[in-house]
């Protein structure tokens, strides 16, 4: 074996080549090195092992002198002792709750949210500690100076030399922070000068980011306005020589810094990491600030460069932040008080310009440290009459040096005197009562609540841009359109829906004040006043740029906090409103009619406190109807019964993003004719006093709530119905903007018995309007079905009139006018009109809920409950089948008369069966959440006139008279769109007469019920016989309220329906199973 192993290496060269042999060599080398390292480790271990004596001392080995058993005993004793010690420790350890309280253990049983907040607090505390340590760590210059950082000696000398050169400038930067620490009270004089250092171009470090120079609008307001903020003071430019000219010229360096990027005011001096002054003085609890009295004043040219102790930049920044925050707080408080006391702005004259002459980098600290807390008043005309002491006090108030002879003092005060007189001469009205006049570069942001001067009401805040005119004498911007009585219409991208009606503003305001907290009446979105740098004349140098980067940040933080608070407040208000509306629903269900509200004719007065750019939720509270969003910013909205078409500046795409909460106030029928924006719709029956018109309890559209239009109807025959639903902000899916619904300007109701002349309804009011305007716009089919006594079925069809003579119901070649032959599927929260192949998406139908009280009662009595109503409905059924014989003959007579008199052209249509003629048209109006409001088509109203028993001659005569009266009363004197829209609805309202024979539906498939959980009740419209369906909706015609029928008096509704006249309902229509009443 050994021989063979010896021989084997000799055969290797034959088998393996040299390359194959290399790995083996490497392996051997590795093994050898490993053994070497192991040897070394072993050697080290042996060297470091403890001696026998040490092991004995530690009780590991028994001592040589004593026996081993004794050693074992000692060991067991020691073990027992440590065991006892541990047991004692375990017994005496604190309770778990104590450990949790000391934050050693985490609470496991506590709520997760509580734990999360605790963890956040803990992290915040740690972060604060870290930030403090980081803020107080020495800067690199300090480390170099104290030889902590190893730097070459030549570099170190050069750095120290540069720091010494920079020292006067950095010192000047801090004099502002030292002095401004006094100016915390609102009564502090406005003349306290803030100073920014304008770095000279010779300093490469500083000029890389030139510090901003404070520019001011030295606005000393009247007693109404708050004290001028600390940051609105005249600049002390560091390089400016002491002169006595009235308009100090900014050095070129200052102008360049005015155009540079926005700087922080908290760091009014850019934080230079290479500055020497980053010391740890901040750790001292009370940094020493040297205060000079006035008699110790030294002119700046004689003052030693390093005469005052410098402040640490961290502390200076902290002081400045605190001051700015306090000033903003004080200003906002004063603004709140001011706006609560005086709702309209008083004339505010700009204050005198405070020019600084003898100012250099360090002069300010001595002059302004102990200023009296009194505002500088206007100077008298002749300064020579003043005593020297008075002149000195005036100088002190303006922060000027008081040393020198009387002529010197007068000379110093003269510029202020001239400026005051010139400003008084201009007498400009400046509505700058805002807390933040802040410039970020060329843009001055001024928060100005837009008010109407007559009404003392803060209507809203519109965001717009106005050029800032800078007069040569005063540097306060004259914002001239801040006082326009109508709201300023913003650019389309920045919208806010404003509507101001001067007559009713104060009433609306008092009501809104009850709903909204006063802080929401303050300005929440700032006006942006853009100042152009070209307009900076030498005298208006005080507006170059404010040293306000920190103020910007503070302001942004505060704005965010305010927004959060406002959103919280709005949430609470919405919850309160929901509660109120629930209460009102309860009250309405019990039939307790309320006394008339004190503001019957309030216009919609939306409060849109949110900045449209942020897209935050604006809650708009409106009386009677929400303001419809026009499709163009200046488009007038036709308000029925109110002949002023007021331009309402509303938006297009931007407002779609807002969820507006529309709250309708309840106003009883006694004042129904006075309401401006309510769409009223009466059906009063003959021989009985009209019942109280039911008011919509709520139209609250939030993201999840559904439209609810409860209408309670009293009396079996008394059918006065008012549906102010013009405020539904709906829209056909084809259009991309929110549109207001067109209002139906009058209902056409054929008298059911011999009519008293006072009660003849506005049936032909539409007839004269047909040829007047070419209505090329197709109008949406509208159906409203009031679920009440037998006489109240109305059918109303809006049709496009392509030409003057075109009948409303005619078979045109328009493919969209398809006859509705197929029955409609029940609508489940969405538009689904069946069998209209070529029409655009059909208009959405909405559920209008009515609670049916079917007993004739007077206004004061409660309506019957639900069960009684059902019984009474059943009791009315036997009278129903008398309908069929009368109906078609009466309608044919009516149509003949109308066609002969030329009011309508003869329609080409099929004669439907008499069974279909007697069928009423019902409306199913399904509810949808608000997020679909933008794409929602307009509601459909179809009103079917009942039978007429009156001779048609007197009817047509009364119709023409009524038309003139109606047109006089209702057509608003707005711009061109107003009459066009009204005439369109005129024609549309009359279309029901022609539509009647086509649109009355087949007997069998008349009613579908949609039983989705929110849509409780109305019967579904189904079409059996051929009839024309107009599903086209138009944007121009959608700018009017729908169902907008304003009557001359409360007693004259639409045509009274006699109680004895046969009804149009078929018997199975009023079957309680077909007509669910879900109002529980």
From Swiss-Prot:
Coiled coil: 539-594
PTMs per UniProt: O-glycosylated.
Matches recorded under SUPFAM superfamilies: SAP domain
Residues modified to Phosphoserine: 66, 531, 535, 537, 913
Annotated Pfam families: RPEL, SAP
Domain of life: Eukaryota
Chain intervals for the UniProt region annotation (Disordered): 170-222, 234-311, 352-384, 477-501, 588-646, 794-846, 969-988
Compositionally biased spans, kind Polar residues: 188-200, 240-259, 794-821, 972-983
Single Gene Ontology MF annotation: DNA-binding transcription factor activity
Domain SAP: 383-417
Tissue-by-tissue expression: Widely expressed. High expression in heart, brain and testis. Lower expression in lung, liver and kidney.
GO biological processes: actin cytoskeleton organization; blood vessel morphogenesis; cardiac muscle tissue development; embryonic organ development; forebrain development; gene expression; heart development; heart morphogenesis
Required for interaction with itself and with MRTFA as annotated region, ranges: 557-585
RPEL repeat windows: 40-65, 84-109, 128-153
Intrachain S-S bonds: none
Free-text note regarding domains: The N-terminal region is required for nuclear localization and the C-terminal region mediates transcriptional activity.
Function field: Acts as a transcriptional coactivator of serum response factor (SRF). Required for skeletal myogenic differentiation.
Known partners and oligomeric status: Interacts with MRTFA and SRF.
Protein name, as recorded: Myocardin-related transcription factor B
Source organism of the structure: Mus musculus
Lineage of the species this protein comes from: Eukaryota, Metazoa, Chordata, Craniata, Vertebrata
Gene: Mrtfb
């Amino acid at each position: 074996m050994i021989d063979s192993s010896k021989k084997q290496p000799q055969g290797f060269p034959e088998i393996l080549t040299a390359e194959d042999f290399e790995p083996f060599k490497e392996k051997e080398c590795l093994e050898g090195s490993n053994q070497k390292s192991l040897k070394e480790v072993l050697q080290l271990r042996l060297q470091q092992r403890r001696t026998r004596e040490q092991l004995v001392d530690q009780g590991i080995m028994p001592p040589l002198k004593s026996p081993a058993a004794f050693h074992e005993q000692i060991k067991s004793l020691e073990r027992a002792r440590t065991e006892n010690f541990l047991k004692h420790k375990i017994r005496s350890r604190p309770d778990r709750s104590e450990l949790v309280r000391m934050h050693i253990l985490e609470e496991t049983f506590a709520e997760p949210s509580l734990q999360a907040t605790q963890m956040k607090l803990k992290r915040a505390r740690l972060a604060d500690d870290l930030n403090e340590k980081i803020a107080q760590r020495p800067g690199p210059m300090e480390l170099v100076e104290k030889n902590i950082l190893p730097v070459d000696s030549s570099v170190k000398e050069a750095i120290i030399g540069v720091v010494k050169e920079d020292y006067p400038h950095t010192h000047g930067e801090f004099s502002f922070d030292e002095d401004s620490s006094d100016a915390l009270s609102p009564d502090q004089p406005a003349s306290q000068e803030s100073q920014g250092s304008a770095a000279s171009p010779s300093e490469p470090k500083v000029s890389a980011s030139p510090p901003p120079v404070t520019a001011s609008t030295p606005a000393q307001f009247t007693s109404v306005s708050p004290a001028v903020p600390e940051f609105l003071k005249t600049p002390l430019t560091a390089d400016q020589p002491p002169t006595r000219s009235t308009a100090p010229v900014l050095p070129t360096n200052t102008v360049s810094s005015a155009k540079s990027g926005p700087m922080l005011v908290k760091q009014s001096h850019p934080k230079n990491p290479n500055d020497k002054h980053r010391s740890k003085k901040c750790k001292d609890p009370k940094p020493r600030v040297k205060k000079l009295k006035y008699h110790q004043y030294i002119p700046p040219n004689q003052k030693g460069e390093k005469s005052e102790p410098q402040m640490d930049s961290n502390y200076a920044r902290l002081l400045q932040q605190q001051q700015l925050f306090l000033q903003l707080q004080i200003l906002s408080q004063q603004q709140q008080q001011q706006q609560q006391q005086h709702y309209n702005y008083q004339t505010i004259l700009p204050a005198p310009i405070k020019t600084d002459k003898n100012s250099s980098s360090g002069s300010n600290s001595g002059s302004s440290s102990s200023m009296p807390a009194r505002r500088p008043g206007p100077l008298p005309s002749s300064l020579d009459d003043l005593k020297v002491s008075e002149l000195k006090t005036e100088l002190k108030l303006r922060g000027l040096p008081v040393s020198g002879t009387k002529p010197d003092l007068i000379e110093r005060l003269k510029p202020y005197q001239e400026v005051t007189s010139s400003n008084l001469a201009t007498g400009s009205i400046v509505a700058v009562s805002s807390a933040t006049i802040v410039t970020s570069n060329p843009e001055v942001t001024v928060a100005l609540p837009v008010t109407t001067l007559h009404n003392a009401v803060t209507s809203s805040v519109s965001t717009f841009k106005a050029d800032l005119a800078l007069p040569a004498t005063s540097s306060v911007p004259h914002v001239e359109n801040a006082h326009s009585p109508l709201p300023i219409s913003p650019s389309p991208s920045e919208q806010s829906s404003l509507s101001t009606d001067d007559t009713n503003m104060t009433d609306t305001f008092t009501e809104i004040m009850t709903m909204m907290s006063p802080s929401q009446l303050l300005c929440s979105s700032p006006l942006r006043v853009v100042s152009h740098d070209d307009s900076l004349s030498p005298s208006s140098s005080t507006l170059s740029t404010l040293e306000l980067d920190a103020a910007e940040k503070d302001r942004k933080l505060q704005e965010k906090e305010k927004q959060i608070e406002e959103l919280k407040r709005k949430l609470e208000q919405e919850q309160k409103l929901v509660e109120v509306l629930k209460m009102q629903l309860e009250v309405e269900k019990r039939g307790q009619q309320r006394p008339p509200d004190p503001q019957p004719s309030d216009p919609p007065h939306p409060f849109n406190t949110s900045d449209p750019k942020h897209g935050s939720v604006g809650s708009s509270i409106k009386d009677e109807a929400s303001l419809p969003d026009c499709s163009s910013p200046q488009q007038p909205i036709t308000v029925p019964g109110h002949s002023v078409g007021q331009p309402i500046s509303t938006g297009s795409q931007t407002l779609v993003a807002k969820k507006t909460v529309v709250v309708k106030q309840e106003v009883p029928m006694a004042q129904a004719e006075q309401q401006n924006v309510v769409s009223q719709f009466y059906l009063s029956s003959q021989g009985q006093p009209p019942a109280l018109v039911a008011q919509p309890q709520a139209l609250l559209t939030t993201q999840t709530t559904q439209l609810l239009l409860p209408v309670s109807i009293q009396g079996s025959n008394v059918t006065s119905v008012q549906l102010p639903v013009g405020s539904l902000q709906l829209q056909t899916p084809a259009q991309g903007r929110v549109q207001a619904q067109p209002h139906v300007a009058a209902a056409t109701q054929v008298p059911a018995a011999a009519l008293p002349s006072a009660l003849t309804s506005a049936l032909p009011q539409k007839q004269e309007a047909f040829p007047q305007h070419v209505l090329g716009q197709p109008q949406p089919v509208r159906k409203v079905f009031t679920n009440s006594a037998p006489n109240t079925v109305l059918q109303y069809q809006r049709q496009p009139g392509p030409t003057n003579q075109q009948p409303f119901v005619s078979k045109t070649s328009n493919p969209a006018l398809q006859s509705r032959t197929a029955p409609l599927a029940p609508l489940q929260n969405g538009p689904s009109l069946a069998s209209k192949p070529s029409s655009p998406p059909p208009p959405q139908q909405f559920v209008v809920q009515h609670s049916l009280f079917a007993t004739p009662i007077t206004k004061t009595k409660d309506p019957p409950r639900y069960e009684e109503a059902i019984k009474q409905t059943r009791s009315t059924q036997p009278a129903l089948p008398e309908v069929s014989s009368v109906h078609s003959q009466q309608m044919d007579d009516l149509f003949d008369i109308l066609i002969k008199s030329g009011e309508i052209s003869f329609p080409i249509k099929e004669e439907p069966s008499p069974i279909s003629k007697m069928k009423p048209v019902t409306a199913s109006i399904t509810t949808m959440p608000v997020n679909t409001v933008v794409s929602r088509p307009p509601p459909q109203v179809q009103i079917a006139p009942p039978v007429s028993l009156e001779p048609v001659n007197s009817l047509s005569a009364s119709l023409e008279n009524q038309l003139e009266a109606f047109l006089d009363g209702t057509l608003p004197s707005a711009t061109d769109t107003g009459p066009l829209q009204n005439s369109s609805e005129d024609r549309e309202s009359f279309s029901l007469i022609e539509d009647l024979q086509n649109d009355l539906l087949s007997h069998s498939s008349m009613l579908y019920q949609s039983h989705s959980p929110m849509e409780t009740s109305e019967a579904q419209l189904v079409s059996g016989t051929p009839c024309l369906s107009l599903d086209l909706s138009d944007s121009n015609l959608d700018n009017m309220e729908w169902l907008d029928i304003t009557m001359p008096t409360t007693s004259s509704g639409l045509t009274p329906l006699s109680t004895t006249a046969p009804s149009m309902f078929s018997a199975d229509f009023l079957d309680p199973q077909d007509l669910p009443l879900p109002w529980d």
